[in-house]
Amino acid sequence: MDSITSYNVTQMNGDTKQEKCDDVLSTSSTQKFCGGCRKKLRSLLPVNYKTEIVELLKLAGPVFISQLMIFLISFVSTVFCGHLGKTELAGVALAIAVINVTGISIGSGLASACDTLISQTFGSNNLKRVGVILQRGILILLLACFPCWALLINTEPILLAVRQSPNVASLSQLYVKIFMPALPAAFMYQLQGRYLQNQGIIWPQVITGAAGNILNALINYVFLHLLELGVAGSAAANTISQYSLAVFLYVYIRWKNLHKATWDGWSRDCLQEWGAFIRLALPSMLMLCVEWWTYEIGGFLAGLISETELGAQSVVYELATIAYMFPLGFAVAASVRVGNALGAGNTERAKLSAKVALVCGVLVSCVVATLIGCTKDVIAYIFTTEEEIVSRVSQVMIMYGFFHLFDAIAGITGGIVRGAGKQLLGALCNIVGYYFVGFPTGVSLMFALSMGIIGLWIGFFGCVFLQSLFFIILIYKLDWKKATQEALIRAGVQLTETKDESFGLENKGCTEEAAKESQITEEGLTDANTDLEGLSKGGEGISEAGAKTTVGAVLTTKQLIVRRGLAVLLMVLILAGGIVLNEMLVRYLR
């Protein structure tokens, strides 16, 4: 009996050992299999791609949040005005549209010149020149307020001319007049944001934007609910909120010393190179404004059909704005990364940033488009309970998913174009795409075929499809070596050939003529691309010794006084002309 028991125990122990061996072998096999999978995944995604994805996401995520904060300022104002009445709500909605078209879009577009100038200069490590570019932007954007004011002061005549209700037009003019002093603050907030984001600093905009929105909600509540100031209270709340955003961000920059590396005090150099700044600023403005204006006009045209079409268009436009913020984050990140790399002379990293940003943005946009498609029948209930509007929005959303994908591609590639400094081609593409293809097609389908806003969005789809195709071809055909040369010139640095025939970067205030005669000519760069890649990783190794803050021909003091004085005089005359025109038109139209 004991022998049988002993045998059984021995047999059990043997079975246990065998099971343990099998478990070990199984675990070992699993680990080998998982390890092999990880190795295969690593081989599919090179290390430099993973690093680039991480860097892009670090920028794109906060950009999305900061843009959402900006959007919420006007959105909250509209929501608070909802209880005032239809006439008041219509007046505020039209006023905000006019402010966006003739004000905010102008400042935001002009500030986009910094997407090229600051990103490339920061990448070159010529840091003090970044501060001078900021000063230049401050002066130019403040002057840009004058023609914007000349348009804004004529809001009522413009609305009366397009047959809006006199009461609505009058309320819109009241709102705009109260908001007008906030325009410089809105412009400065845009410029400060560009100054930081092109250095890879994003979170301050998120933090100050959140604080500004909290203050905006409180002020709207006090002015509209407690004090019952109506439309004037809403405008005053918006004005205070714009100043709070600009002041909060300025204080944060000073508090955290984010300006120390790039700011060397006000310099007379900021009066130089206005032509170079404007040559980038105007196409940048057109790239943004052409698109922005088209959608705003689309809303007005929808109102000519019926209130249902107008309501549906308003909902679709709000949804499109929110959805676009996802690819916008990647567009900004691509612009920053490409500009930084070109300024550092790192051509290959610039191309890598462009590829990774486009792929990541498209993947995220596919997810967003899928979500919109799955919720198309209910998503409009966020904004309204009117069944006719909900049904109309649902019909547009069927097509909008495809529109969003190509809109994302166009937006991200547009960011790459800005980072490379090719805004002129981008502006021409947008003008042709929207005003010669998309908008005429949409309006024809909208009215001639009685398709309403569905026809309008079909026209917009054709536009973004052509846009995305053009930008992809442009980036594919882009001479990246030449783009690197141009970035180095803008950044105030140039290539110098050393004794061992390698290339280095030297900070110089070279003129374009001198640059053409130097080693940075296209012929001199036939074999330089490999050398360029090893020069700098984000600007390291580029000495600031002898750095110049001015590039190109330097104007004398007398020339500066005359030219900048004439610029100021011209802006003041434009504003004066707007005031005189307003007095004449109001009397005539009334």
From Swiss-Prot:
Transmembrane domains' residue ranges: 60-80, 89-109, 138-158, 168-188, 200-222, 232-254, 275-294, 314-334, 352-372, 396-416, 431-451, 453-473, 566-586
UniProt topology in membrane: Multi-pass membrane protein
GO BP of this protein: organic cation transport; xenobiotic detoxification by transmembrane export across the plasma membrane
Cytoplasmic topological domain residue ranges: 1-59, 110-137, 189-199, 255-274, 335-351, 417-430, 474-565
GO MF terms held by the record: antiporter activity; organic cation transmembrane transporter activity; transmembrane transporter activity; xenobiotic transmembrane transporter activity
Keywords: Cell membrane, Membrane, Transmembrane, Transmembrane helix, Transport
GO cellular component: apical plasma membrane; membrane
Localization annotation: Cell membrane
Pfam families: MatE
Coiled-coil stretches noted in the UniProt entry, renumbered to this chain: none
Side of membrane Extracellular, spans: 81-88, 159-167, 223-231, 295-313, 373-395, 452, 587-590
Family per record: Belongs to the multi antimicrobial extrusion (MATE) (TC 2.A.66.1) family.
Function field: Solute transporter for tetraethylammonium (TEA), cimetidine, metformin, guanidine, N-methylnicotinamide (NMN) and also the zwitterionic cephalosporin cephalexin. Responsible for the secretion of cationic drugs across the brush border membranes.
Name the record gives this protein: Multidrug and toxin extrusion protein 1
Species, as recorded: Danio rerio (Zebrafish)
Gene (name only): slc47a1
